Amino acid sequence: MEFIDSLTGTKSRLQKTFRRFDQIFDQLLDEHINQKRETKEHKDLVDVLLHIQESGSDEIPLTKDNIKAIILDMFAAGTDTTWIALDWGMTELIINPKVMERAQAEVRNIVGDRSVVLESDLAQLQYLKAVIKEIFRLHPPNPLLLPRESMEDVSIDGYDIPAKTRFFVNAWAIGRDPESWENPDLFEPERFMGSTIDFKGQHFELTPFGAGRRMCPAIIFGTASVELVLAQLLHSFDWELPPNTTPKDLDMAEVFGITMHRIADLIVIAKPRFP
């Protein structure tokens, strides 16, 4: 109830957070409006949205608040799913130290003495990309993809599906299907080395971001974020479990929902490599 939120201070905190986000988005939009971006290479999503707004399209009318809402959706969705992927990824690497050693060796060989991993380094980190594919296969942040609706009557494998049927795609189950994957319950990034399988919507055995025109619009942002952060964690730190703790002690139970978190927090010791 609203009066309870007022008494507890929840309403005022939400309003303060909203105003803070609104100021950030105003600043972001002003920066894009005030600076000239004449070349296509330097245009980003905000530039495209502002161009649509300026063109005054009747098909896609956009207000400033609409653009802010789209930006918020991109960041909010990407932040939660990125954190989930990193949490599961670090857990699997702690449980599988040989995989971590190989991934660390690759990252440190490419990055060298630099303390910061650059986005330009990512294209050379092929084993790290395989690790991330394996993370998404076993632990898709969104276990059930957004619902779809059949446009017409169709028959698939003996099942008659009428038009207007709402259905869900279980990405979690597909990633563990023994008909598609050998040893599906094992964390083995090597399965993707030399393989053309990717998660960009062309291979239906691996669809953590969906497929088709309605696939996740933040796939590039999301994957780049996971790659960059995971590479930095592996490059900058050596990782180990606390004393008297073994990989078998880690609780791999999941909280099923719109996104799939681990029930237990991951507690590890980070040893910095750089002063």
Predicted features along the sequence, with ranges:
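Alpha-helical membrane-targeting segments
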Residues: M1-K16
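Conserved cytochrome P450 catalytic core segment spanning the I/J/K helices
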Residues: R13-L86, R114-D121, L125, K129, ...
